[in-house]
């Protein structure tokens, strides 16, 4: 790509910055980052909330190209090939890349929004951005009652982080088990046991109907009840404050803090307004190109071959693939084989590592090999279809995950399944 080609990237997260850095100084790249923070790795926010990492540890490598922080793209004019920004500036492009990411899903719960329909009651938090993380950190003290709504990867991460901060945590999951998308029933049960030992109370098959609130105390009131939010984090006059979560069966969970961890939704507003083709995400082909040949999309906002990944690994792979396309490469993007990894910290050596990939629930006719050690609290399972490894899940001991993932990604025929699950990784 020559320096005359103007590339504008909307989004200063993992995908956008990876692409900009891959293109390098030879390309005239402008990155529009909506957040004012130094770009950060969203994957590490739970560690910041838990108090294990300082926010600056999450910083992403500074891009060589121009990064405009705190600038929001408000309109894409495809005819004039320009992006209009909220500060009144206009960024012309030859190639536009949408790396707008995703938003936290706000479920349709009774009482969730203030009367204006936009603001959440004080004490109710999403957990998606650094601002969300900082607001939660300010609100949580030992003894604070926290309810996490959602038992997927995000909800589990938030629950253990809050428990590490000394909060009294309840996790409400509508499904039958935790992390249903990644874990089988046995692995999920082990995860639930570990979280319980960290102090998290778990409710599965539990549908939340609404949040309960009360009018905030007058600003002149000097007292703050024990375990409340940090000074300066009080609700504004007239704003309501959360007091609990109401379940569909009528049961009520008392809460000082409620965390919404109900998944994410691709941010497609700009693309939709520009007339690009949208389904779940912004539709892209094998060159990550949208329905407009001058516009590409990568990361959480992109939908490729019917799949919206919403994972860091896929965002990075798509950024690398697009960088190759824009610099003259011809290898198509064929999708990402996503591997999920998570470490749940505990006291002393009581942490739990888990990894999952591919299809962890077997189909009829599949072969399954399991190794479980209740004493060591380890669990390993692989699913084989025909002569191919199609998925696996590991908890407690991940020394073999590299060899398993390579076999899975390469489509190799595993010759000795038991050996592949042992500590030497099959070598």
Model features per residue range: what roles?
Residues 2-7, 60-145, 219-230, 246-248, ...:
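FAD-binding core/adjacent interface of flavoenzyme oxidoreductases
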Residues 135-183:
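Rossmann-like NAD(P)H-binding beta-loop-alpha module
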Residues 251-275, 350-427:
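C-terminal catalytic lobe of FAD-dependent flavoproteins
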Residues 67-84, 91, 165-284:
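A Rossmann-like FAD-binding core segment of flavoenzymes
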Residues 11-14, 128, 149-153:
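Glycine-rich Rossmann-fold phosphate-binding loop(s) that bind the pyrophosphate
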Residues 2-67, 161-182:
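Beta1-alpha1 glycine-rich phosphate/pyrophosphate-binding loop at the start
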Residues 3, 12, 301-398:
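Mid-to-C-terminal Rossmann-like scaffold of FAD/NAD(P)H-dependent oxidoreductases
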Residues 119-141, 219, 231, 235-246, ...:
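FAD-site-proximal beta/loop scaffold in flavoenzymes
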């Amino acid at each position: 790509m020559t320096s005359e080609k103007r590339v504008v990237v909307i989004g200063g997260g993992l995908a956008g910055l990876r692409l900009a850095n891959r293109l390098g100084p030879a390309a005239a790249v402008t990155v529009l980052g909506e957040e004012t923070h130094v770009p950060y790795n969203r994957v590490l926010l739970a560690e910041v909330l838990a108090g294990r990492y300082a926010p600056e540890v999450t910083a992403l490598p500074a891009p060589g190209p121009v990064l405009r922080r705190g600038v929001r793209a408000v309109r894409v004019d495809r005819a004039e090939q320009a992006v209009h920004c909220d500060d009144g500036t206009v960024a012309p492009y030859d190639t536009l890349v949408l790396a707008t990411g995703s938003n936290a899903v706000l479920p349709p719960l009774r009482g969730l929004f203030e009367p204006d329909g936009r603001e959440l009651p004080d004490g109710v938090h999403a957990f998606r951005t650094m601002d969300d993380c900082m607001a939660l950190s300010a609100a949580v003290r030992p003894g604070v009652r926290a309810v996490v709504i959602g038992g997927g990867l995000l909800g589990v991460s938030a629950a253990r982080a809050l428990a590490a901060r000394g909060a009294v945590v309840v996790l409400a999951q509508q499904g039958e088990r935790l992390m249903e998308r990644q874990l089988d029933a046995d692995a999920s049960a082990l995860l639930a046991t570990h979280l319980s030992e960290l102090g998290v109370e778990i409710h599965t098959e539990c549908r939340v109907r609404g949040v309960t609130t009360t009018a905030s105390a007058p600003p002149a009131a000097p007292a703050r009840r024990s375990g409340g939010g940090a000074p300066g984090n009080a609700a504004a006059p007239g704003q309501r404050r959360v007091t609990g979560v109401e379940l569909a069966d009528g049961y009520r969970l008392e809460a000082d803090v409620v965390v919404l961890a109900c998944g994410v939704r691709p941010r497609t507003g700009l693309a939709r307004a520009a007339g690009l083709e949208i389904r779940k995400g912004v539709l892209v082909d094998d060159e990550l190109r949208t329905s407009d040949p001058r516009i590409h999309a990568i990361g959480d906002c992109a939908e490729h071959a019917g799949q919206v990944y919403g994972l860091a690994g896929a965002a990075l792979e798509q950024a690398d693939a697009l960088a190759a396309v824009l610099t003259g490469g011809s290898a198509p993007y064929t999708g990402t084989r996503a591997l999920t990894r998570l470490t749940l910290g505990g006291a002393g050596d009581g942490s739990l590592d888990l990894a999952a990939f591919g299809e962890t629930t077997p189909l009829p006719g599949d072969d399954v090999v399991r190794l479980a050690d209740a004493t060591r609290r380890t669990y390993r399972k692989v699913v084989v279809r025909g002569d191919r490894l199609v998925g696996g899940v590991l908890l407690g001991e991940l020394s073999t995950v590299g060899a398993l993932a390579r076999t899975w990604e390469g489509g190799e025929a595993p010759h000795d399944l038991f050996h592949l699950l042992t500590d030497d990784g099959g070598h």
